[in-house]
Amino acid sequence: MIELCSVEKVFGQLRAVDKLSFKIFQGEVFGLLGKNGAGKTTTIKMLTLQLKPTAGEIFFEGRAIAGNEIFIKSLLGVVPQHLNFDQDLTVEENLELHARLHHMKKSARRERIDELLKFVELERVRKSFVRELSGGMKRRLLIVRALIHRPKILFLDEPTVALDPQVRRKIWELIENLKAQGITIVLTTHYIEEAEALCDRVAILNRGKLAALDTTENLCAGRTLEEKFIELTK
């Protein structure tokens, strides 16, 4: 479980995140929604230890971040919005490099890479250079890379941005399969229907504050999630 307690982040005169308090439960798909500038990216960066909160605390499995950074980082897999592969390495070489960064033994690296490439149906392109892959393949490869060290928590920042509907559905299937394996998933998305389809609960942020937090069913209450989102973020 992840718990945020009165978390704030201030940049100069800008209060990007304002006293956020909520819990993310083990094994759920948790969505963070909000307009541009609502605080989603800043919140994700604090949850993935890329930024330190100005105030408040974040707990992972009951442990505060301070003094537990190595343990907490071992729990996390992060899929960024922007592609950050070495385009001149092959699929296999990129994954091998990342596995080494996690100090995985050679036999374990091989086994895990084979397992994950099969899982996301990228076995046939393992020897291809990353620059040769389609956008959908690169998105799936980002997910594989984040899963290489068997994290318990996976952060997905806009995982289907700029993908066509068919490829987006394939990513959705991957996320559903990961949830079935018991992995906790935290995702940000601009696609309201994506949150509605995938998330057990959704937090809607507005101007750095928590505007709503509930299941998609309870948030909608006879309306669409998009209508509720528009109402809360005016």
Model-assigned labels for residue ranges:
Residues 129-133:
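Conserved ABC ATPase signature
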Residues 96, 100, 107-125:
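Conserved ABC ATPase "signature" region
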Residues 213-214:
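ABC ATPase "signature
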Residues 150:
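Conserved catalytic motifs of ABC-family nucleotide-binding domains
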